[in-house]
Amino acid sequence: MKVAVLGAAGGIGQALALLLKTQLPSGSELSLYDIAPVTPGVAVDLSHIPTDVKIKGFSGEDATPALEGADVVLISAGVARKPGMDRSDLFNVNAGIVKNLVQQIAKTCPQACIGIITNPVNTTVAIAAEVLKKAGVYDKNKLFGVTTLDIIRSNTFVAELKGKSATEVEVPVIGGHSGVTILPLLSQIPGVSFSDQEIADLTKRIQNAGTEVVEAKAGGGSATLSMGQAAARFGLSLVRAMQGEKGVVECAYVEGDGHYARFFSQPLLLGKNGVEERQSIGKLSAFEQQALEGMLDTLKKDIALGEDFVNK
């Protein structure tokens, strides 16, 4: 199993690469790519960690050597948020980066499962889909927007509030991956109940958690370490499922039946070829139903922005 990380010299990429080097199954290969000249050195640095995961780093304009034979590609390349920016301010720079990298994937490893981490995910996933479609290699079961950070944040905040162990809380999060499009299904956590005020406050905190980190880092970056952990969790789940493990479920942002929007984050049963089954979002509370209906316009606009970027 070969996993490629594109954008591997950045804050998310380095954290992700470290976690994959220590946690991928023995015999896996890890390839790191970034435009930055330091990238081969990041791979050398990580190669000294004693695990049975082969690692190689590549830099420059051409990602092809890193992509050859890749089964999974995780894209974290792009610029990070600064205070005062929202994820959509990143669009102007990151849209072009994602388009370029996905064009290279379409040529070099069109069969690979692709996880998009680069924000704004609501839009960059639509860009990737259109690029793959133009190249004639699009498989909607193999393209994911990685929303796992919303899930791990939800798990952490709920556990803190309710005095539970964070490892035993699992909150499904649906919708998209920015602001109001992030919808944690707090009504679906077994054995935990909330007041209306707690639900309103928690939902808002989860939606704004990225901004919390950007502000706390005071201009020095955005959520890189927790995002690295979230991306590793998703990537490792995908690898386990592709290697035949049964019952692996993760929420991610994928193209579905279009019932709510063309792309939508929901629980997915993962399998050998990516998405095996798009699972139901279950029964929503009145609050969740209202939040879902209220976000769809925003989500659809985000998606259209990505489609238009490729097709204009």
From Swiss-Prot:
Its EC number is 1.1.1.37. It is an enzyme of class 1 (oxidoreductase). Keywords: NAD, Oxidoreductase, Tricarboxylic acid cycle. NAD(+) binds at G7, A8, A9, G10, G11, I12, G13, D34, N94, I117, T118, N119, M227. The keyword Protease does not apply. It holds the Pfam family Ldh_1_C. SUPFAM superfamilies: LDH C-terminal domain-like, NAD(P)-binding Rossmann-fold domains. GO terms for biological process: malate metabolic process; tricarboxylic acid cycle. It catalyses: (S)-malate + NAD(+) = oxaloacetate + NADH + H(+). The active site is at H177 (proton acceptor). One of its GO terms (cellular component) is cytoplasm. PANTHER family: MALATE AND LACTATE DEHYDROGENASE (PTHR11540), MALATE DEHYDROGENASE, MITOCHONDRIAL (PTHR11540:SF16). Catalyzes the reversible oxidation of malate to oxaloacetate. Homodimer. Belongs to the LDH/MDH superfamily. MDH type 1 family. This is Malate dehydrogenase. It comes from Klebsiella pneumoniae subsp. pneumoniae (strain ATCC 700721 / MGH 78578). The gene is mdh.
